[in-house]
Amino acid sequence: MKKLLLLGIIFLVFISAQAQKQKVILDCDLGDDIDDAYAIALMLASTDKFEILGITTCYGRTNDRAELACKLLYETGLEQIPVAMGRNTSNIDERANWYAEQYYWSKGFNKVKPIRQSGADFIIEQLRKYPNEVILFSVGPVTNMKDIIEKDPQVLKLAKKVIAMFGSFYVGYNGSPTINPEWNVKVDIEASKKFVNSGANIVYAGLDITTFVKWDKMMQERLLYRQSPLTNALCSLKTLWSNTATPTLFDAVAIGMALYPDLFKTEKVFIEVDDKGFTRIDKTKNPNSEIGVGINTDEFLKRIMDVYLKQNLGR
């Protein structure tokens, strides 16, 4: 009887802990720039705070991106997390069809495979299943978001929040005072317009806060010395991407906005996407979005380093 009571208490504690975790989905273009890998690693290493419902891939060779995500999950012992491929758009131009160097890390990996469901359908299903409970991270071109809106125009409004690495509002690349057509916006301008006009609760981690987050050589060396499955994967992918360049962790900032809201300053404004891929602010209109305008960069880097070094993910 005492054993049954003890088991019951343990079960209730487990259920309570799960209930307190934030449900999340990540939509990403893993494999191009290296920042997607650091974003996924931050999310995976934060399973004490996140209940990860799944990862979806977007833009270009979504099958190769999904294969890369599957291997990363397998290496860290988290292969139960589903991976769904978004619509393959590798035929739109040469850039979209690029076989990125990071893909070689997972080439031929077949121990875990993506689910059959498309990325858009997976996200729709999860948002319908858990209305107002899910944070959807969007850290790539928003082609999947467009597909979702066209299939189910109201469903993005069921997300508790969408946090998107998207846009350039007051600041451009490398801190320039001149704004730029940010990559995730300009890759699919039609999709970007639909996304910002979707009526969803969207928080934008644009260049205003992401362009300052640099991962220098000393930081990378600390990861290398950690020697864990997750940090080894990051180091391998970083080397394939570039052995010398300093990464900007654009996408990891989007994850950080959910983990560490105290490090960010935001502003509610009305934004729209123009025909050239600029994200324009119109302060004469009622706000339709929330944009990041400030970040405590040093503290953010310190915190994510702690997460990477203290995790013990593995098989």
Question: Where are the predicted features?
Answer:
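Short N-terminal amphipathic alpha-helices
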Residues: 53-54, 81-82, 267
